Amino acid sequence: MSFDNEAEFDREEKMDAKLWKRLFGYAMRNRALFVRILVSMLIVAIIDALYPILTRFAIDRFVRPDAEPTADGIWLFFAVYAALVIVQGFCTTRFIGRSGEMEMAISYAIRQEAYLKLQTLSFSFYDKTSAGYLMARMVSDVARLSDMIAWSITDFLWCGFYMLFCFGAMFWFNWKLALIVLAVIPPLAVVSLYIQRRILRYQRVARKHNSRITSAFNEGIMGAMTTKTLVREEQNAKEFETVTEDMRKASIKASVLSATFFPLVISLGAVGTSLALIFGGAGVQATLGGTETFLGVITAGTLVSFINYASSLFDPIQQLAGIFADMQSAQASAERVLSLLDTESEVRDTPETEAKYGTSMDPKRENWEPIAGDITFDHVDFYYKESEPLLRDFNLHIRAGETVALVGETGAGKSTIVNLICRFYEPRSGRILIDGTDYRERSQLWLQSSLGYVLQSPHLFSGTIRDNIRFGRPDADEESVRHAAQMVHADTFIERQQKGYDTEVGEGGVRLSTGQKQLISFARVILANPQIFVLDEATSSIDTETEQLIQSAITEVLKDRTSIVVAHRLSTIRNADRILVIRNGAIVEEGDHETLLKLGGYYHDLYMHQYEEDAMQEALK
């Protein structure tokens, strides 16, 4: 198995401030919610910082080791303390609820933006990007980011406010002792920077392997039948084990670094508390003895409060370290999500075209010119890889209402021609004209809304048979839906279903046979009533009898419409106005069925070969 989109994992291990500023911008979209969280966290942090001050007051007033204790004001003290606890509890409940609400809002905003982006990307993106990769971005990465952003904001606000008040109180109590205690912060910053960079490196590798695992699961599920028929279970299991083992190793390394980081913070916090106890204790003894140290006068209440601040100060530092560690860990996810959001479609309309014709989300149908269906390739060059050109100086004219069939070996360029007509890709040089106008001067939606494309491998969407038939025309009435099904002889099998047109097809149409899915796909296109039909080996999944019925039915449908047919069974294109034999991206034979048979070339040989095969199969029956 091969995996795409992995270049993004190989980036420098450093925090990207612009990236996180952009992500945290999703939280700022709901400013009212953010302000509520801000106010709640400010109140909680202030109350947390007030507790050591109350402790200092209680010791110096009610205990007083240097004088006679007093109980004056103790009930007021209890009342104030209780009031602070109640207010803090209320605000804590509020910010927890609001943070959960923000998490959901961020998740919704990112997923909505990502889904809309996927609707606008060209086929080249999907050719290069696995479904497993996209699912991992849309589900696990977005969930990880929304959770981290929402709760990181909450934690960051509390840590910031609390540390600010702690620093202020410590410098207010004794600025010299405060400087001694805070001396451990610079080495903590250096250690944090080093470990965080290492964490990001291993987390990036782990997420890369996680994406591979998701792709492997997706391929394993989608290709289960092929795996079993080729007896690939053991080999697939070994390949999967290799991927999971690589992820396990990278995850363990990242976990070890994270586990090492927090004890370091705790140890440095203990050093700070010890410094407060040693120097502050000496100051208290000197004060009680009637002398002073270089720290000045320090009361017992001040020392206890200082120790409380010193020990609790490293809790927010530890939490901040955790936030930055999580950000380092999640940065790989953030990069991938934003990379998806920033992906530009290779095929896109100009701003001037969008202004006139609109976009897929805001079409301006009143400005759309009617399409007759005349198609011209004017000296077109095209390649997927520059080193492997597929079309060179390719010229072709398809008249409006003409049925043109494309025949050739696999890889000859038939599907490429179709993809260019549909503007799934654009020429590297040259022009493609629709009704005499370069189709790049008009919108993709203008063209594709007049296209009916039936693929060799049909895709149905979750829902009922009726929903799928009118997928391209949701406002179609019941009579139109049934008429479209009858035209392609799909109504026979539909009526045999227990729920008829209300039958659920399952994800991808899994509850129907390939032939049944193809019939529904035909009905869907006919109901959409396009001016240009594209049939890409569309009858290869249907039995011969049904195929003949469909051919007779769609002959009437295709009347006065342009149709391009990519055919494997040559018997299905005998009535085409023109048949083009494509080889190595060039037209080597051209004419109707009878003309090409008389020519005695590639088409003649291929047709006779298929005729003999069909005759043999009929004889075997």
Where are these regions (language model features)?
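Membrane-integrated ABC transporters
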Residues: 1-48, 63-80, 95-99, 103, ...
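An intracellular "coupling" helix at the cytosolic face of ABC transporter transmembrane type-1 domains
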Residues: 24, 31-32, 123-124, 140-149, ...
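Hydrophobic alpha-helical transmembrane segments of ABC transporter permease domains
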Residues: 39, 47-51, 91, 103, ...
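Juxtamembrane helix-loop junctions of ABC transporter transmembrane domains
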Residues: 8, 12-16, 39-43, 47-60, ...
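Helix-loop-helix
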Residues: 66, 169-183, 253-335, 340-341
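ABC-type nucleotide-binding domain
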Residues: 357-621
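Helix-loop junctions and hydrophobic alpha-helical segments within the transmembrane domains
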Residues: 114, 118, 227, 337, ...
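Transmembrane helix-loop-helix hairpins at lipid-water interfaces of multipass membrane proteins
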Residues: 34-91, 171-176, 285-300
